[in-house]
Structure formats: structure tokens, C-alpha cells
A protein has these predicted regions:
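Outer-membrane beta-barrel proteins
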Residues: 1-374
Length: 374
């Protein structure tokens, strides 16, 4: 404990020595109550009502810059999760980088989000279970050891590209290259003017799945998000396509929140149901509307997902889903507020639960959380 305190004091010394170093972060926690129900040909399985205290992406970071002359400067950032429920976290496990910025834009290297990971503006909710927010819509973005270029602003238009190298993605294979490459390419464009913003991104994730001929193929992800945020009104929507990003079993697990047993069989297990170990292609869409009334901002989100079909077989493995989240935010100040929501999510009854049963999944959730940003 004493060593930890000393380390924090030493780490804080540069903050007093340089005005270019900024300490920032947020603390967010919520209480969630939820229940999952699996209904199939052989009857229903209903979970107990679960109540949990959650950390909701609490973080702390340091960032700064140094003017190198002219318009050129060094930029850097070190950011990490700080799980206030006591979960073990590392250092620099969020966006952390060093780079250069100038009239040409900026180039960074480190642990970086691709643009897909940044397209979550229409998801304002605090949640742990996917029923209570747009966890399905935001699932394909990631953060990797990568290099990224962001263009300057051309009258509201910007673009970016990022690359996560093979040997960072496959570190155990970096000197032999006997395994399929898993490097990732991502690119995106955005336009913003007078409160309106439109974002579009494409991700090409190598080494994601195997086709019928045994060839290893890349996951292909495309996403569009647009929103209007001005004069107290927020209206936003998005469409998301993912091919080969996950298996049917993995995709189904997003809806069960860990309650996976139906008649004693794990409905998300590849061994229990190898048919659903096939990669799937999925399309989902979402829309969020909110309006600020003084300190209160009521919101509603609706999401719909079309059936997930096998990339090789074309078979419907997970049925369509529909989701509604209703709630809002109350702000005590610019930095502190409360979020609360009620949510309902339903996966259609044509989902392959097991080899012998089809059915669907329902999930209900309620959550209330407090946040503070600094």
C-alpha cells in the first residue's frame, strides 16, 4: 500500500512542473436489475432476478503535447480503466499513444481505437447487460496496438485510416507465420456541420473464419451513424453490417447475459451445438431520440436486428431481435448526473437453441447510475 501511494505521488510531480500535462477521467457506476427467459419447443427456462452493482467504463488518463516549432507538435496520451467495483485492471489499457500533429493532420502509434469503436454517439446509456443499451450495435469496434492517421478538417469533412499489424495480433506466431494472419484494416469518413454529423466506417479483420473450401477469410464490417444534436434536440440513427465477425453461438450469447442453459444444455456452446459454431452475417439498426428540458433529458432508443445466417450455409441460426430502451438523464452540473432506464429485448422464436429445439430469448432490465467527469 505504501509503495502504491509513493508511486502515485511521484507520478503526480510532472503535473505541477508542466501546464501541458492534463489529468482527466470519469467515474461511472450503476445498479442493474434484470431477468432472462428462454422459451423453446420443450418449455421455458427463467432466470432468477439478478441485481448487480456495476462499473460503467470508469477511467483515468494523462495527456499532453509539446510544440516543436511552426505548426508541428508532439501529442501523447496514457489512459486506463479504473474499475470501482474492484475488478483487476492494467495500465494503458485504453487509448494510449504518442504521435505528431500538424497541418497534415495527425499520426499516432500505440493502443488505439479504430473508427468503428468511436461510433457510439447514439448509445448514451450506462449499462452492463446488452438489453439496457446498444451493446449489439457497438460490438464490432475494437482497440488494438496500431498506427492511425487522421486527416485535418476540410470544411467539416474528415477521414482516417488505421492498421493493426499481424505480429501484434498474432504475437506467438511472429517469427514463423505458420498461422493465418489476423491483422486489421479500418477506414472511415465523417462530416459535421450545423449540428448534423454523419459517420461511415469499414473494417477488414483478417483470419476471422473458414469458408466451405477451408480457406481462412476476413470479417467484413460496415457501419453508418448519423445524428442531429442542436437546440436541445438529439435525433440519431445507424445501420450496422457484420459478416464473419462471430459465430452464431457467440452472437446468441450477446442476448443471454450469461444465462445460457436450456434443458441442461448450454445454447451458446460450440461443442454442445457445433452447427452454431459457423460464422454468421448480421444486419442491425438503431435509432435514439432525446430532448433536453432544463436539467432533464428524456430519451428513447429502438433497435432491430435481422436474422443471423451462416456465412457458408445460409441457414437462419439466430432469429431477428427487437429492443426498446426508455429512460433519461438528470444533470446536477456539467460534470455530474444520473442516468436511468427500463429496457426490453426479444430474440425471435425461430432461433436454433439446441440441435432438438428452436425458440427465443427475452430479457428485461432496469438500471440507475451516477457519473462524474473530471
Amino acid at each position: 500500500m505504501k509503495k502504491s501511494i509513493i508511486a502515485l505521488v511521484i507520478a503526480g510531480l510532472p503535473l505541477a512542473a508542466s501546464a501541458e500535462v492534463i489529468l482527466y477521467g470519469q467515474i461511472k457506476s450503476s445498479v442493474t436489475v434484470g431477468q432472462v427467459k428462454i422459451k423453446g419447443d420443450a418449455g421455458s427456462e427463467t432466470s432468477s432476478t439478478a441485481t448487480s452493482i456495476n462499473d460503467n467504463t470508469s477511467r483515468i488518463g494523462f495527456k499532453g503535447s509539446e510544440n516543436l516549432g511552426g505548426d508541428l507538435k508532439t501529442i501523447w496520451q496514457v489512459e486506463q480503466k479504473t474499475d470501482i467495483t474492484g475488478g483487476s485492471q492494467g495500465f494503458a489499457n485504453r487509448d494510449s499513444f504518442i504521435g505528431l500533429q500538424g497541418k497534415f493532420g495527425k499520426v499516432r502509434a500505440g493502443k488505439l481505437s479504430n473508427m468503428l469503436n468511436e461510433m457510439d454517439t447514439i448509445d448514451p446509456w450506462m449499462y452492463k447487460t446488452n438489453a439496457a443499451g446498444l451493446g449489439i450495435f457497438t460490438r464490432t469496434g475494437n482497440r488494438n496496438a496500431a498506427v492511425r492517421y487522421d486527416s485535418p478538417d476540410f470544411g467539416g469533412f474528415k477521414f482516417n485510416v488505421s492498421y493493426a499489424p499481424r505480429d501484434n495480433r498474432n504475437p506467438s506466431d511472429k517469427y514463423t507465420h505458420t498461422k493465418a494472419a489476423k491483422d486489421q484494416y479500418t477506414g472511415g469518413v465523417s462530416f459535421s456541420k450545423n449540428g448534423f454529423t454523419a459517420n461511415a466506417a469499414y473494417g477488414h479483420y483478417n483470419g476471422a473464419y473458414t469458408d466451405n473450401s477451408g480457406k481462412v477469410k476476413a470479417a467484413q464490417i460496415a457501419k453508418v451513424e448519423t445524428y442531429y444534436d442542436k437546440d436541445n434536440l438529439f435525433v440519431g440513427g445507424g445501420v450496422h453490417y457484420a459478416k464473419g465477425h462471430e459465430t452464431a453461438n457467440k452472437y446468441l450469447s450477446y442476448f443471454t447475459d450469461g444465462f445460457n442453459k436450456y434443458k441442461g444444455i448450454d445454447i451458446t456452446d460450440d461443442i454442445a451445438d457445433p452447427v452454431k459454431s459457423e460464422a454468421v452475417k448480421v444486419v442491425d439498426a438503431a435509432v435514439t431520440v432525446g430532448y433536453k428540458l432544463g436539467n432533464v433529458t428524456p430519451r428513447i432508443t429502438y433497435a432491430h436486428g435481422w436474422p443471423a445466417k451462416g456465412v457458408n450455409s445460409g441457414e437462419k441460426l439466430v432469429d431477428k431481435f427487437d429492443q426498446v430502451v426508455v429512460g433519461g438523464q438528470y444533470t446536477f452540473s456539467k460534470r455530474t448526473g444520473i442516468n436511468a432506464q427500463l429496457a426490453y429485448l426479444k430474440v425471435g422464436n425461430k432461433t436454433r437453441l439446441t440441435a432438438a429445439n428452436k425458440g427465443g430469448v427475452e430479457q428485461k432490465a432496469a438500471s440507475v447510475g451516477l457519473y462524474h467527469k473530471f
